[in-house]
């Protein structure tokens, strides 16, 4: 499929270096010139502005970008206290934004986890697990709570067994959650959770002798996750800080948080007030409830009391979501019941109230049938309370068709695309057949005129590395190299979807998403040129420096202890 380019410049013509100097305030007497704290020069600054301009240098004053332009012009702004970074030809992109992640709550388990995001072989995965055992005491839990699938292992993509995990971690209970479809446990974990004594428990897969294999199906593992120990108090803060460091290391500087738990968010607020928060959090939240008609009646007054946009550019609440009515579920792999008219009626009651109060909406919507059903209700709501300027979004969005996209365009509904195929592409093919190769149809979405952005739905349903997501969008390949997507897009349009378009989604288009004078200085210096590196190497791009609000929050050259 031929894809429209988002900007007015096409192909390599976008690589022309900007000639002028774009400065906050345009011009000013020397005495009024803000102090330039930092200049990055001799680089390839991929601004991702409306013209996809390429510059050489950028100046930062405080937490904002003061100027973008040529080396010579930007250098003139330097003062005696200005710090300089010679990029030596390296590429700089805007801080990457994920429009939908589940992370605040997962800070409670991050310290126990061995992440396999981007790991392509079973051997490498097991080596990481084995290495972890040398850093924990005997008997301590080791987790991997999602963000991977056995399909990503190019050398051996079969389920793990308890015996295999026993060899790697004989003295520690191990719990490995593969995305949201199954889990694998070693013998110590089976014993700790009482499964050896109760092999008939829900979801336990047994061998011919009736002995648990260590494999737990989706029907059973979710309940087990809730029995695992979590970090609290000071450990919770340390675990969450470790998670944020990993996000910064990946190039992420902001994310839409699907859920901002009341017991965790104050910690982030304190860090932000102290100038210590190294990532921006934009909350998708709701008052809860709404599982039956009576509960909906009780919920409606609470919607009127919701307070959005009362924070700042580090923490803010920007949308209602991601669930609306509990009886309407659209899960990844489980059997989906047919949508009932009475449930859609309750869904419409809630969304009508959301629209009446002028609130943005971000709603979990996966498959074709659900998209149709929800658009029917949204069109009915729109007749009573127009939603065009509310930035309502359908999230996940794996199976849209052209007719649905046209309806969304007329309504002004946004698409938050979360490609589960990055790790679950093989499973999608088994479950959906040929249709899986159009999940999600990026070229169709790009051509439709619907505003859309890329996210992950990490860290359990999907991996969290933005360059892995960008690689999938451009090459159509999942982790491990299997082609799982037909409708790919250009690397420019993919980057726009992971930066500028997501800034719009979280109502931060004046602050984030591009490297322009006046915007917040969220930047990522990478080890190779995103625009020219062979497409199959996009997944391997590594940030060497990440900046949030003019502060360096990750520096690959720094000692490990300070990264």
For each of these PLM feature ranges, what is it?
Residues 2-18:
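Bacterial N-terminal signal peptides that target proteins for export
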Residues 16-27:
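Bacterial N-terminal signal peptides
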Residues 31-41, 46, 50-304, 313-370, ...:
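Divalent metal-binding segments
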Residues 91, 141, 520-523, 552:
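Residue-level marker of beta-strand positions
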Residues 308-310:
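Accessory "access/gating" subregions that flank catalytic or transport cores
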Residues 352-362, 366-392, 396, 402, ...:
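His/Asp/Glu-enriched, well-ordered alpha-helical/loop segment
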Residues 414:
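Ligand-binding beta-strand-loop-alpha-helix segment within the catalytic cores
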Residues 555-563:
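Extracellular/periplasmic ectodomains of large secreted or surface enzymes and adhesion receptors
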């Amino acid at each position: 499929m031929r894809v429209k380019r988002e900007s007015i410049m096409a192909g390599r013509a976008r690589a022309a270096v900007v000639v002028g100097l774009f400065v906050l305030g345009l011009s000013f007497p020397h005495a009024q010139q803000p102090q330039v704290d930092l200049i990055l020069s001799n680089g390839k600054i991929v601004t991702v502005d409306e013209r996809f301009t390429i510059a050489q240098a950028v100046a930062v004053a405080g937490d904002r970008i003061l100027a973008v332009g040529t080396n010579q012009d930007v250098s003139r702004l330097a003062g005696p206290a200005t710090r300089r970074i010679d990029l030596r030809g390296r590429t700089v992109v805007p801080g990457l934004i994920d429009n939908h992640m589940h992370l605040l709550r997962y800070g409670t388990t991050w310290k126990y986890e061995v992440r396999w995001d981007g790991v392509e072989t079973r051997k490498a995965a097991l080596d990481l697990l084995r290495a972890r055992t040398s850093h924990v005491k005997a008997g301590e839990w080791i987790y991997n709570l999602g963000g991977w699938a056995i399909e990503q292992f190019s050398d051996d993509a079969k389920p793990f067994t308890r015996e295999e995990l026993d060899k790697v971690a004989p003295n520690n209970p191990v719990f490995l959650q593969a995305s949201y479809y199954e889990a694998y446990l070693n013998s110590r974990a089976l014993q700790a959770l009482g499964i050896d004594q109760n092999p008939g428990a829900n979801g336990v897969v047994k061998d011919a002798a009736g002995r648990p294999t260590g494999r737990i199906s989706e029907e059973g593992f979710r309940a087990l996750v809730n029995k695992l120990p979590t970090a609290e108090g000071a450990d919770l803060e340390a675990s969450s800080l470790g998670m944020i460091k990993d996000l910064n290391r990946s190039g992420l500087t902001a994310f839409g948080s699907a859920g901002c738990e009341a017991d965790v968010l104050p910690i982030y607020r304190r860090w932000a007030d102290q100038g210590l928060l190294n990532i921006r959090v934009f909350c998708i939240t709701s008052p809860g409830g709404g599982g039956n008609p009576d509960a909906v009646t009780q919920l409606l007054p609470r919607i009127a009391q919701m307070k959005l946009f009362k924070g700042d550019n580090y923490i803010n609440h920007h949308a209602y979501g991601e669930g609306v009515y509990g009886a309407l579920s659209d899960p990844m792999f489980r059997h989906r019941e047919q949508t009932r008219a009475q449930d859609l009626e309750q869904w419409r009651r809630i969304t009508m109230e959301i629209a009446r109060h002028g609130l943005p909406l971000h709603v979990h919507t996966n498959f074709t049938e659900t998209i149709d059903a929800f658009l029917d209700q949204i069109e009915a709501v729109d007749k009573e309370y127009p939603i065009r300027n509310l930035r309502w979004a359908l999230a996940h969005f794996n199976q849209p068709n052209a007719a649905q996209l046209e309806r969304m365009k007329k309504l002004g509904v946004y698409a938050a695309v979360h490609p589960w195929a990055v790790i679950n592409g093989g499973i999608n093919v088994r479950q959906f057949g040929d249709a899986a190769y159009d999940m999600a149809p990026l070229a169709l979405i790009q051509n439709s005129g619907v505003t859309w952005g890329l996210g992950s739905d990490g860290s359990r349903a999907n991996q969290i590395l933005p360059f892995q997501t960008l690689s999938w969008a451009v090459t159509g390949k999942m982790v491990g190299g299997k082609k799982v997507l037909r409708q790919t897009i250009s690397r420019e349009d993919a980057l726009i979807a992971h930066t500028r378009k997501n800034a719009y989604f979280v109502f931060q288009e004046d602050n984030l998403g591009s490297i322009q004078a006046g915007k917040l200085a969220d930047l990522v210096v990478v080890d190779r040129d995103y625009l020219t590196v062979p497409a199959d190497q996009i997944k391997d791009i590594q940030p060497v420096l990440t900046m949030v609000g003019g502060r360096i929050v990750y520096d690959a050259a720094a000692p490990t202890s300070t990264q």
